[in-house]
Amino acid sequence: IYVGAGTSARIGIQDGVELFPTFNWPKNRLEFIIAGGIQALLKAVENAEDNINLAENIVAEKLICHEDVVIGLAASGNTPFTCKVLEKAKFNNALTIAISNNPKGKILEYGDHKIILNTKEEVIAGSTRLKAGTAQKICLNIISSMVMVKMGKVKNGIMNEMIPTNKKLRLRKKLINSKI
């Protein structure tokens, strides 16, 4: 379960949506919790990141428990919505991963595993879609790739369970099969 607000949510989605076609990850084992909901992907939903009541309700509705892994992303490390989801998920015994670009981020309190991406100040002050966003994307790529390698979905550096959903990927799958 990827959790975030704004740019962090969008970056989580970038990583998560590729798990099925790249690694044949079961679609029913992938969830996104986005401050402001799905509409927040295309435009800003004001005050969504501050709505901790909604965060609590979503955790309860999704029945997040010990069988879940919840990855919370927050460039500031202090996004109330994301912190609350991770706090409640941890309370429900889910495995929690807190990713913060701020070494003093509150979200780190709720992570069983804490990842600090200390990108410091942005070139354009306050614009977390730059260095912070890039670092989050790289971090998620590393995490998801490591998990898929450990699960046997990569063999000799080749994604052996890729789903060929178009012409380009069908050709790639033939090439992969010839190498395995």
Language model regions located:
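Glycine-rich phosphate-binding loops that contact phosphosugars or nucleotide phosphates
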Residues: 1-138, 144-151
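Helix N-cap / loop-to-helix initiation motif
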Residues: 78, 179-180
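Internal, active-site/partner-interface "lid" segment
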Residues: 145-179
